[in-house]
Amino acid sequence: MSLILPLEKPALNLRPLLWLLLPLLVLATLFFWPLSLIVEQALRGANGEIGLETFRHVVDSKRFVGALLNTLQIAFFATAGCLLLGSAMSLILVFIPFPGSELIGRVVDTFIALPTFLITLAFTFIYGSAGLLNGTLMSLFAFELPPVDFLYSMQGVILAEITVFTPLVMRPLMAALRQIDKSQLEAASILGAHPLRVIGQVIFPAALPALMAGGSLCLLLTTNEFGIVLFIGAKGVNTLPMMVYSKAILESDYTVACMIALINIVLSLGLFSLYRLAASRTGVRS
């Protein structure tokens, strides 16, 4: 007669759930709860009811439409400038080494650690109305007014953001360029390929993931950049982060400020989704 022994169920291991609970609590406390407060404040109308009254009021405002267009224009032009300048400098530093190229690479790395207001302060000292360039030109050619006045415009903001965020493109791009097999470049040169063709058919496909990663990061940062626009004080240049600041701090209109901040968050998530879509279409893993 055989005995049938009951099978013992293994004890439930709760340790993985406990390890998961801690980061969820941190996210809920530091991110989801403040975000929910912003959403609740943005959707609460003047009568205290939840609705889209504030949203309709904001999107119908010409000031908001202008700030949205300025934000997108600055973000796209600054990102394009970062990609062009970062690509050119990375190609030179990696494939055309010269005395001091390593030092320049280290200086580029240090730019990432600098606060943005230091770059804008340097721009003010150089290109400002009483800066070094205008002072020199006015003393040499007896100009009555400063001849260089682009700094306090959208062009000045874009140039400052290109200077600040180009290293974010260069770091991953230079790392990717150093991984390219030099024998492929030598073979293309021996076969008589033009340098531009080598860049387009050999270097660019290998560097595309790094370009997309750096470009997407620049696009998100320039969309949400606040310090450069505020410090330069560009005339007539209002962006969504600047509008959030003015509504909350200067006008004490927290409901409208929260709604604009919520729209800015949705815009950033939309741009990031476009990047992920483009990355999946091109076969780039991210």
Curated annotation (Swiss-Prot):
Domain of life (superkingdom): Bacteria
Presence of the UniProt keyword Cell membrane in the record: yes
A Pfam family: BPD_transp_1
GO BP: 2-aminoethylphosphonate transport; transmembrane transport
Gene3D superfamilies in the record: MetI-like
Residue intervals passing through the bilayer: 19-39, 76-96, 111-131, 150-170, 202-222, 254-274
Main subcellular localisation: membrane
Membrane topology type: Multi-pass membrane protein
ABC transmembrane type-1 domain residues: 68-275
A cellular component term, taken from the record's GO annotations: plasma membrane
Matches recorded under SUPFAM superfamilies: MetI-like
Keyword Oxidoreductase in annotation: no
CDD domains, per the entry: TM_PBP2 (cd06261)
Compartments it resides in: Cell inner membrane
Keyword annotations from UniProtKB, A to Z: Cell inner membrane, Cell membrane, Membrane, Transmembrane, Transmembrane helix, Transport
Family: Belongs to the binding-protein-dependent transport system permease family.
Function: Probably part of the PhnSTUV complex (TC 3.A.1.11.5) involved in 2-aminoethylphosphonate import. Probably responsible for the translocation of the substrate across the membrane.
Entry protein name: Putative 2-aminoethylphosphonate transport system permease protein PhnU
Source organism of this protein record: Salmonella choleraesuis (strain SC-B67)
